[in-house]
A protein has these predicted regions:
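Catalytic-site signature of metal-activated, phosphate-bearing donor transferases
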Residues: 65-73, 82, 91-216, 381
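Conserved donor nucleotide-binding strand/loop of the catalytic core
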Residues: 44-74
Length: 384
């Protein structure tokens, strides 16, 4: 046993295929508690075989906060640190040692790096800070979906960053998310003044193609006095632009994207979206300008709103095309070469680079021929 008593707790349903991998990862804890909410496979049996304490509850109507709170209720009262975890998430080895090295009794919760998604080459794609590690007393989960930990303890709520602690997400692609929308609508009904809930609901409407509802909800979010996080406001404006683009209102989309840039000029995402809009409208000066501005930003924000595409080959690809159209062929070659280096298996990028190089060589050759002709002509007719 280490410096602190650490208990991992989770909720599950029909995740038998993840049990062994997950139990291997959380085995560094002193105790593992799992609430099974209705599995019809061998999830519960396998967890027990691996040493977890498994409890069963039927939750109707379903809410994620209710499920997580019931799971937390089974955590021993003498636990020093609670680690909320899902079975499709995997801690990297040595997480306990890193957590104990950073934790002090004065802290109420811990923040660490979460890998949400991966690139095609299996390198981390989308990463941001997560904080689902907390002390035993004073916490409850709130909101039916996109639930968060609410603190009600007497001493200050203090968070520690745990350097080197990484949690990796390996989701089940077959798992449905259809239940999210009605739960978000319920959450908005229960919390009408919560800007975070309004933002998530507006985004979910966009995901479902419910464009008018998304537009109305996101505009409502932007008017909320508590909606002050500039990066999230920028994202709401980007989502509004996506909805308007889908409705064919390109000028309206551009207006919101320029507002998004002004709202949070330190993130790449609105510049990329404006560049993509310019590409669809053949507005090559706009594309070029947005690419140039975006690439001046060299540090990711670290928030969950980060879009991997803004840090991949897309900006260089768009820059190459815009420069080609603007007859800036040398710059086009440079952008195209960088794009291909970032995505070496992309046949389209390879063909684009070949075409751009061919044009660049042709222009240089023609320029050289004209220069030679000018020199010859100068000697024959005496003109300057």
């Amino acid at each position: 046993m280490g410096k602190y008593k650490i208990c991992v707790y989770a909720i599950t349903k029909n995740e038998e295929k993840f049990v062994d991998r997950w139990m291997d990862a959380v085995s560094e804890a002193d105790e593992v508690v799992v609430l099974d909410t209705g599995s019809t496979d061998r999830t519960a049996e396998k967890l027990r075989e691996r040493g977890a304490k498994v409890y069963k509850e039927k939750i109707d109507p379903w809410r994620f906060d209710t499920a997580r709170n019931l799971a937390m209720d089974h955590v021993p009262e003498d636990a020093d640190i609670c680690v909320s975890n899902d079975l499709d998430e995997v801690f990297e080895k040595g997480w306990r040692e890193k957590l104990e090295a950073a934790w002090q009794p004065c802290f109420t919760r811990a923040r660490y790096l979460f890998t949400y998604a991966y690139n095609s080459d299996s390198t981390p794609g989308k990463q941001f800070a997560m904080e689902k590690i907390h002390r035993r007393k004073g916490f409850r989960w709130v909101h039916p979906v996109h639930e968060v930990l609410a603190y009600s303890g007497e001493d200050p709520d203090r968070t520690v960053w745990v350097e080197g602690l990484v949690l990796n997400h390996h989701p089940d692609p077959e798992k449905p998310r259809a239940q999210y929308l009605p739960l978000l609508e319920l959450s908005a009904e229960e919390n009408p003044d919560d800007d975070r809930v309004a933002f998530w609901l507006g985004r979910e409407y966009m995901f479902h193609g419910m464009l008018d509802k998304s537009i109305d909800t996101l505009k409502k979010y932007l008017k909320m006095p508590s909606a002050v996080w500039t990066e999230e406001r920028c994202a709401a404006m980007r989502f509004l632009a996506k909805c308007l683009t889908a409705k064919g209102d390109f000028s309206g989309a551009a207006e919101w994207l320029f507002r998004a840039v002004a709202e949070c000029p330190t993130v790449r995402e609105p510049y990329l979206q404006l560049a993509m809009l310019g590409y669809t409208r053949n507005d090559w000066p706009l594309v070029f300008c947005m690419v140039e501005q975006a690439l001046k930003i060299t540090q990711k924000s670290g928030s969950y709103l980060f879009e991997p595409e803004a840090w991949g080959f897309s900006l260089y690809d768009l820059g190459a095309i815009a420069c080609y159209r603007l007859e800036l062929y040398q710059k086009s070659v440079e952008y195209a070469e960088t794009a291909l280096k970032m995505s070496p298996g992309d046949g389209r990028l390879q063909k684009n680079l070949e075409l751009i190089r061919e044009k660049y060589d042709e222009v240089r050759q023609n320029s050289g021929d004209k220069a030679k002709g000018s020199e010859t002509g100068g000697e024959s007719d005496g003109k300057v």
